[in-house]
Curated annotation (Swiss-Prot):
Group of enzyme by EC: hydrolase
Residues holding GTP: 93-100, 175-179, 239-242
UniProt subunit comment: Part of the signal recognition particle protein translocation system, which is composed of SRP and FtsY. SRP is a ribonucleoprotein composed of Ffh and a 4.5S RNA molecule.
Primary location recorded for the protein, binned into one broad class: membrane
Name of the gene this protein is made from: ftsY
Pfam families, alphabetized: SRP54 (PF00448)
Catalysed transformations (reactions): GTP + H2O = GDP + phosphate + H(+)
EC number: 3.6.5.4
Record's function text: Involved in targeting and insertion of nascent membrane proteins into the cytoplasmic membrane. Acts as a receptor for the complex formed by the signal recognition particle (SRP) and the ribosome-nascent chain (RNC). Interaction with SRP-RNC leads to the transfer of the RNC complex to the Sec translocase for insertion into the membrane, the hydrolysis of GTP by both Ffh and FtsY, and the dissociation of the SRP-FtsY complex into the individual components.
NCBIfam families: ftsY
Entry protein name: Signal recognition particle receptor FtsY
Length: 293
């Protein structure tokens, strides 16, 4: 399967390779291609139902743009603006999705904007997660608030935000646990952390971002729904997209959850985070569909 995310990276690096494109594709074949990109079948049907038996690149592009800009999605898939200081980001997701690395990338973005950042090692039951965040903190020269292994993560969140207030920090990024094998405990823990954040911020708003492993495709939606039901998420960051052809899951997130896709993780370095551009995404998806095999 053509990896159109690699194409996005190549474009950014100025290494784009020109490929021959087909002028049209039969609808049945197009459905198979889009399924291969891990787009849900009911969404595919919705996109193509008003199109003929032969579909051109322009027709598919228009259908995709109508989808992402339609009334039911457009307003709901914009990130709300929060001006509170410190601006707190509660970062959630299953273990292995790339939460800790993504937090480092977000902190790097904050530093690039000449803001002061602070990290909270809230996955207190995993010493490796705390250590990894501390290493990133050292590399970025950003303080990491941590606690003894097994400490209450809500207390850690409280202490992190209190420290940020005292130090006039601009942005706070708090890591969390992601042990989905025990859903009830995890949901209770995350709810408690969110409540604590609200309390210390005196009910001022804060962000709740989900880190979703892009290699899992649409199967990651089940995880996403659990986190969204628990926290009322504000946005999604898709990771590990430099090595997958399952980018259609981005459309499935918009379709199922009506949440904004904020960034795409394209590697392990702190700069490998690309702001999601829906027009570029659609353009590259359409190019990938119509490339001659």
């Amino acid at each position: 399967m053509f990896n159109f995310f690699k194409k996005i990276v190549n474009k950014i690096k100025g290494e784009e390779v020109k490929e021959k494109k087909r002028e049209s594709v039969p609808k049945e074949e197009l459905e198979e291609i889009l399924i291969g990109f891990d787009i849900q079948y009911d969404l595919i049907e919705s996109l193509l139902k008003h199109l003929g038996d032969l579909i051109t690149p322009k027709q598919l592009e228009v259908a995709l743009l109508r989808f992402v800009r339609g009334e039911s999605y457009y307003d709901k898939t914009r990130l709300k603006t929060i001006t509170t200081k410190p601006l707190v980001h509660l970062i959630v997701g299953v273990n292995g999705a790339g939460k800790t690395t993504t937090i480092a990338k977000l902190a790097k973005l904050s530093l690039k904007q000449h803001k002061k950042a602070l990290l909270g090692a809230g996955d207190t039951f995993r010493a490796a997660a705390v250590k990894q965040l501390q290493l990133w903190g050292e590399k970025l020269n950003v303080q990491v608030i941590s606690a003894k292994e097994g400490s209450d993560p809500s207390s850690l969140a409280y202490n992190t935000i209190e420290s940020a207030i005292a130090k006039n920090i601009d942005e706070v990024f708090i890591d969390t646990a992601g042990r989905l094998h025990n859903q009830t405990n995890l949901k209770n823990e995350l709810s408690k952390i969110a409540h604590t954040c609200s309390k210390v911020l005196k009910d001022a708003p804060f962000y709740k971002f989900l880190i979703l492993d892009g290699t899992q495709g649409s199967s990651g939606l089940t995880q996403a729904k659990i986190f969204h039901e628990t926290l009322a998420l504000d946005g999604v960051i898709m990771t590990k997209l430099d090595g997958t052809s399952k980018g259609g899951a981005i459309l499935s997130v918009l379709y199922e959850l009506k949440l904004p896709i904020l960034y795409l993780g394209m590697g392990e370095k702190e700069d490998d985070l690309i702001a999601f551009d829906e027009e570029r995404f659609i353009e590259d998806l359409v190019d990938a569909v119509f490339v001659e095999q």
